[in-house]
Amino acid sequence: MGSLKLVCAVLLCMMVAAPVARASLTCPQIKGNLTPCVLYLKNGGVLPPSCCKGVRAVNDASRTTSDRQSACNCLKDTAKGIAGLNPNLAAGLPGKCGVNIPYKISPSTNCNNVK
């Protein structure tokens, strides 16, 4: 009986001390966060505050190299699929929102080089 209590106590300590896994954003979540940006990326004009909120959310969730590379690949693939996308507006979007990302949002970006 005493050894069962010890095993339970050890397991409980392991569960409490284990690091909590943080889920990364999925590509559909990234696209959802950036949907308010599409009209701006095509036509320019006024940048919606909801767009910058989405840009910040994606940046905040992209903490590791793997997260940033995944976000980059999602943005790259999404940019390829938006007819009429202005590449200069896409590349400048993070800066317009006060966010610094380590890559250019472009269909030609090599996301494997993102750190």
UniProtKB/Swiss-Prot annotation:
Q: How is it used?
A: In order to protect patients that are allergic to hazelnuts, it is extremely important to find ways to detect trace amounts of hazelnut in foods that should not contain it for the food labeling and safety purposes. This protein is used in the development of these methods. For the detection of hazelnut, a liquid chromatography tandem mass spectrometry (LC-MS/MS) method in selected reaction monitoring (SRM) mode is developed by using a selected marker peptide from this protein as standard.
Note the PROSITE patterns from the entry. Answer: PLANT_LTP
The answer to keyword Secreted applying to this record is no
UniProt keyword Disulfide bond present: yes
What Gene3D superfamilies does the record tag this protein with?
Plant lipid-transfer and hydrophobic proteins
Sorted alphabetically, the keyword list is: Allergen, Disulfide bond, Lipid-binding, Signal, Transport
This protein's assembly is summarised as:
Monomer.
Name under which the protein is recorded: Non-specific lipid-transfer protein Cor a 8.0101
Source species of the chain: Corylus avellana (European hazel)
Organism ancestry: Eukaryota, Viridiplantae, Streptophyta, Embryophyta, Tracheophyta
